[in-house]
Structure formats: structure tokens, C-alpha cells
């Protein structure tokens, strides 16, 4: 049998060599030392040989981490990042594994409606999407403003239903005549410090 010209390895063990050794007589081969000295462990990913199994195990752990990073990069690439983002996962998949998840970059969902309740003086705001507008005096739907669209973008979404509410007029951009504060384009803050009213 010609074992020197062909070899078949599985997990670093030459299979053809072991079968030919079993077929040969029990005569020792010349120049062979103990079995542990001549045994080499081969990486199944890059075919690099190692002297012991511990070194091979550590090396294969590095391959495992590389595969995890590539798998994460592929998952991110299949989900698709927004087009306005300056990051291209196809150019370097290892770097794309450290990118923020796409759902953090997508357009935010609108927050629930905030209802102004006329019945309770201690807690004026109620949160809920299923409250009907006939039970509330006014409602405020903040949409994109709470997520970085700017407070001025909320001013156009304020609607009042029946009655004159100074709290709602402040959000809509009207001036509060009692305090003299002019709120322009939606929400404004009086940042002047004073000791009294």
C-alpha cells in the first residue's frame, strides 16, 4: 500500500497511516520514537499543525470567535442598515459586528397619546392609546418630537377640543399673558434665573 504518497486526515489524525499500521506486522518501524512525540494536532480550519491538543484548542477558540463575528456581520447585512448611515457592512464584515443594531437607527415609533384629564387636578397627564378624545379636554400626540425631531415639530400636532386651556396654548406657541413669557414655535423655556415671580 502506498501510504507515503497519499494521506487522508481527520481532526489531525492521518487515517490512511493508522490503517496501514494496523495492517502491518507488529515490527517496530526504524527511527520512530514514542507515539506522543510524533503526534501532531492539525487545525480543521487552516490546516496548521500543533504539538499538543491544548494549543490546538486555544487556536480553534480564536477561529470560533472569528466565525461568530462574521455570522453577526452577515445577520446585520441581511437586515439592512439605513441608506443615510455612513457605514458599509459589505466592505469590512469584522467592523460591522460592532455597529449599533439596525432597529436603534431606524425611525422611532410614536409614543402613546398623552391626555389631559379635566377630572384630576393632582395628576394632569394620563398615558394611553385607547382613551377616546370625547373623554378628554385636549390631547397631545408627540410623534417624532420626542426622538430628536425637535420640540418645534410638536407644535403643529397639538390639538385642543373645546375650551381654552393655557397649558395647551403654551404647547401650541401662544403667549402666556400672566407670566409674560413668549414661547415661539412650540415649546420654549424661560432660562432666566430670578428670585421670585
UniProtKB/Swiss-Prot annotation:
It is found in: Nucleus. Keywords: Abscisic acid signaling pathway, Cytokinin signaling pathway, Developmental protein, Differentiation, Gibberellin signaling pathway, Metal-binding, Nucleus, Transcription, Transcription regulation, Zinc, Zinc-finger. InterPro entries: GIS3/ZFP5/ZFP6 (IPR044299), Znf_C2H2_sf (IPR036236), Znf_C2H2_type (IPR013087). Highly expressed in roots, mature stem and lateral branches. Expressed at low levels in rosette leaves and siliques. The keyword Transcription applies. One of its GO terms (cellular component) is cytosolic ribosome. A zinc finger (C2H2-type) spans 41-63. Disruption phenotype: Reduced number of trichomes on sepals, cauline leaves, lateral branches and main inflorescence stems. It comes from the Eukaryota. One of its GO terms (molecular function) is DNA-binding transcription factor activity. One of its GO terms (biological process) is trichome morphogenesis. Induction: By cytokinin and gibberellin. The keyword Transferase does not apply. Probable transcription factor required for the initiation of inflorescence trichomes in response to gibberellin and cytokinin. Acts upstream of GIS, GIS2, ZFP8, ZFP5 and the trichome initiation regulators GL1 and GL3. Acts as a negative regulator of abscisic acid (ABA) signaling during germination and early seedling development. Seeds over-expressing ZFP6 are insensitive to inhibition of germination by abscisic acid (ABA). Plants over-expressing ZFP6 show formation of ectopic trichomes on carpels and other inflorescence organs. This is Zinc finger protein 6.
Amino acid at each position: 500500500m502506498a501510504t507515503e504518497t497519499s494521506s487522508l486526515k481527520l481532526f489531525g489524525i492521518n487515517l490512511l497511516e493508522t490503517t496501514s499500521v494496523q495492517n502491518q506486522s507488529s515490527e517496530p518501524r526504524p527511527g520512530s520514537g514514542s507515539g506522543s512525540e510524533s503526534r501532531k494536532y492539525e487545525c480543521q480550519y487552516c490546516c496548521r499543525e500543533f504539538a499538543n491538543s491544548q494549543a490546538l484548542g486555544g487556536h480553534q477558540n480564536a477561529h470560533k470567535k472569528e466565525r461568530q463575528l462574521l455570522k453577526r456581520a452577515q445577520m446585520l447585512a441581511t437586515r439592512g442598515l439605513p441608506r443615510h448611515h455612513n457605514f458599509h457592512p459589505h466592505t469590512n464584515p469584522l467592523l460591522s459586528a460592532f455597529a449599533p443594531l439596525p432597529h436603534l437607527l431606524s425611525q422611532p415609533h410614536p409614543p402613546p397619546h398623552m391626555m389631559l384629564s379635566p377630572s384630576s387636578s393632582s395628576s394632569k397627564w394620563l398615558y394611553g392609546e385607547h382613551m377616546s378624545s370625547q373623554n378628554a379636554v385636549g390631547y397631545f400626540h408627540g410623534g417624532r418630537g420626542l426622538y430628536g425631531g425637535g420640540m418645534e415639530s410638536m407644535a403643529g400636532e397639538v390639538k385642543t377640543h373645546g375650551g381654552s386651556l393655557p397649558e395647551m396654548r403654551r404647547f401650541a406657541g401662544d403667549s402666556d399673558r400672566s407670566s409674560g413669557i413668549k414661547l415661539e414655535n412650540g415649546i420654549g423655556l424661560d432660562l432666566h434665573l430670578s428670585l421670585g415671580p
